[in-house]
C-alpha cells in the first residue's frame, strides 16, 4: 500500500544510493521496518556502482537472495518480510573505469584494481545468475540499429516466456524459472547427453559451485522459453555458461 492507501499495481523499482546502510537495505530499526529488499518485492532492486556500497551491507543480501524473504529479530518481536526481488547491479571494471578498454588506457595499479573488484565477495557473485561484461559501443555500430530487434519485439518475447512459465509452474505456486528448487530443476531442466558433457567440462574448468550449476540450468531453461522451445538444447547450455564466466575472469 502507498501512503495514500492505494494498491500498488506496478512492479516496484528501487534504486538505493551506495551510501545505504545494512538497515536501509535489509530492514530493521526500533520498529523493525522493511528495507529496500522488501520494498522491491516482486520488482527490481537496482544497485548502481556496486563496489561503492559498504561490503558488509552487500553481504546481508546473500541469504535473502536464496530464501526470498528476510527475518528481522528484535528484543520483543520477530518480523518476517517478503523479499522476492530481481537484483540488477552495475559496476566499472576498476576505479578509473578503463581496465580492459581498447579505447583508453587504464591508470589504476594492479593493487587498486584488486581492492576494487574484491569488494564483491565470491559467495555474493555466485548468487547472481547472469554476469555480463559490456564493452563501450562504437559510434558507427550505435547508429546502425536498423536490423536489431526492437524493444517492443523483445517485450513480446519476454511476455510470452513469462506466460509459459506461469502455466508450467501453476501447481507449485511459483511464477518463474528463477524460483525453481533443486527438485524442480531436475524435473523441468532436463538435458541430453551432449549437454551433460558440456556442463561437466564447464563445471571442472571454471571450478563452478553446485549453486552455479543449478543457475546455469535455470538460465538455459529461460533461453529455451524465450525461443519458444520445449526442450533445452546444447546451444542454450553454452550460452548460459557464458553468462557465468565473469567471476572466474576477474574475481
Where are these regions (language model features)?
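A short alpha-helix capping/helix-coil boundary motif
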Residues: 1, 14, 39, 178-179, ...
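Conserved P-loop
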Residues: 1-10, 231
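Conserved alpha-helical scaffold flanking the Walker A/P-loop in AAA+ ATPase domains
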Residues: 7, 12, 20-45, 78
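Hydrophobic alpha-helix-in-membranes signature
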Residues: 11, 15, 92-94
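Histidine-centered active-site/metal-ligand motif
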Residues: 17, 41, 236
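Short, basic, glycine/proline-bearing loop/turn elements
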Residues: 19-23, 102-105
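Basic, amphipathic alpha-helical bundle interface domains used for macromolecular binding and assembly
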Residues: 31-32, 50, 55-251
Amino acid at each position: 500500500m502507498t501512503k495514500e492507501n492505494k494498491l500498488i499495481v506496478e512492479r516496484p523499482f528501487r534504486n538505493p544510493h551506495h551510501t545505504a546502510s545494512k538497515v536501509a537495505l535489509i530492514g530493521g530499526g526500533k520498529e523493525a521496518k522493511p528495507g529496500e529488499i522488501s520494498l522491491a518485492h516482486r520488482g527490481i532492486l537496482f544497485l548502481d556502482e556496486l563496489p561503492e556500497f559498504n561490503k558488509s551491507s552487500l553481504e546481508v543480501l546473500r541469504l535473502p537472495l536464496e530464501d526470498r524473504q528476510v527475518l528481522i529479530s528484535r528484543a520483543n518481536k520477530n518480523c518476517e518480510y517478503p523479499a522476492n526481488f530481481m537484483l540488477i547491479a552495475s559496476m566499472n571494471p576498476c576505479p578509473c573505469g578503463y581496465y580492459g578498454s581498447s579505447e583508453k588506457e587504464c591508470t589504476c595499479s594492479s593493487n587498486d584494481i584488486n581492492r576494487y573488484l574484491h569488494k564483491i565477495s565470491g559467495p555474493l557473485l555466485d548468487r547472481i545468475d547472469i554476469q555480463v561484461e559490456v564493452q563501450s559501443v562504437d559510434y558507427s555500430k550505435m547508429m546502425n540499429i536498423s536490423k536489431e530487434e526492437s524493444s517492443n519485439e523483445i517485450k513480446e518475447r519476454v511476455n510470452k516466456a513469462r506466460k509459459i512459465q506461469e502455466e508450467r509452474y501453476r501447481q507449485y505456486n511459483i511464477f518463474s524459472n528463477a524460483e525453481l528448487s533443486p527438485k524442480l530443476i531436475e524435473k523441468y531442466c532436463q538435458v541430453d547427453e551432449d549437454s551433460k558433457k558440456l556442463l561437466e567440462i564447464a563445471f571442472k574448468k571454471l571450478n563452478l559451485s553446485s549453486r552455479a550449476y543449478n543457475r546455469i540450468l535455470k538460465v538455459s531453461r529461460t533461453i529455451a522459453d524465450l525461443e519458444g522451445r520445449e526442450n533445452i538444447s546444447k546451444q542454450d547450455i553454452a550460452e548460459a555458461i557464458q553468462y557465468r564466466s565473469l567471476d572466474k575472469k576477474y574475481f
